[in-house]
From Swiss-Prot:
Family classification: Belongs to the RRF family.
Role played: Responsible for the release of ribosomes from messenger RNA at the termination of protein biosynthesis. May increase the efficiency of translation by recycling ribosomes from one round of translation to another.
SUPFAM superfamilies: Ribosome recycling factor, RRF
Phylogenetic classification of the source organism: Bacteria, Pseudomonadati, Chlamydiota, Chlamydiia, Chlamydiales
Name of the protein described by the UniProt record: Ribosome-recycling factor
Cysteine disulfide links: none
């Protein structure tokens, strides 16, 4: 494992954390709320983003325009089945979703999930650091000074990525508090 590969793995953890938390409902309409919803169409299960365009019509409303108008009812059922606390409204060949303002209880629950997920991401980053350091110590070709230098660099990377995760979590928490 090289320093560059460790950094790439850490960046992957950060990206995964961003994707996981993007779907948290903050009270503002955002396509990420429903794009991963699975829908039963054409005899198979597909992601909503693969069968429809999802747009924001205003701050609290999503507009879903299926590529095939025959999938409207399946999309509505898929959204209801996803238990997102969202009520789809079928309007001809489109589905409209009014995003309700989150309740205080919901906000507390999402903040708990957010903190748990951010801690899991930081643990994953620290595990990458530990694996890197373990491999360094087993490498007989490196001098003690080289090992110390690389350990310092991997620690700097770890701190950088953990800080980015904390900042993203704080931003998301602030979004939840201001809506």
């Amino acid at each position: 494992m090289t320093l560059a590969s460790a950094e790439k793995e850490m960046a992957g953890v950060l990206t995964f954390f961003q994707k996981e938390t993007r779907g948290f409902r903050t009270g503002k309409a955002h396509p990420a709320l429903v794009e991963t919803v699975t829908v039963e169409v054409y005899g198979t299960t597909m992601r909503l983003s693969d069968i429809a365009s999802i747009s924001v019509s205003d701050m609290r409303q999503l507009l879903i325009s299926p590529y095939d108008a025959g999938t409207v009812s399946a999309i509505s059922k898929g959204i209801l089945a996803a238990n997102l606390n969202l009520q789809p409204i079928v309007e001809g060949a489109t589905v409209r979703i009014n995003v309700p303002e989150p309740t205080e209880e919901y906000r507390r629950e999402v903040i708990k999930q957010l903190k748990r997920k951010s801690e899991e991401a930081k643990v994953a980053i620290r595990n990458i650091r530990r694996t890197f350091n373990d491999r360094l110590k087993k490498d007989d070709n490196l001098t003690e000074d080289a090992v110390k230098s690389l350990e310092k660099k991997i620690q700097e990377l770890t701190d950088k990525f953990c800080k980015q995760i904390e900042e993203l979590a704080k931003q998301k928490e602030a979004e939840l508090a201001t809506v």
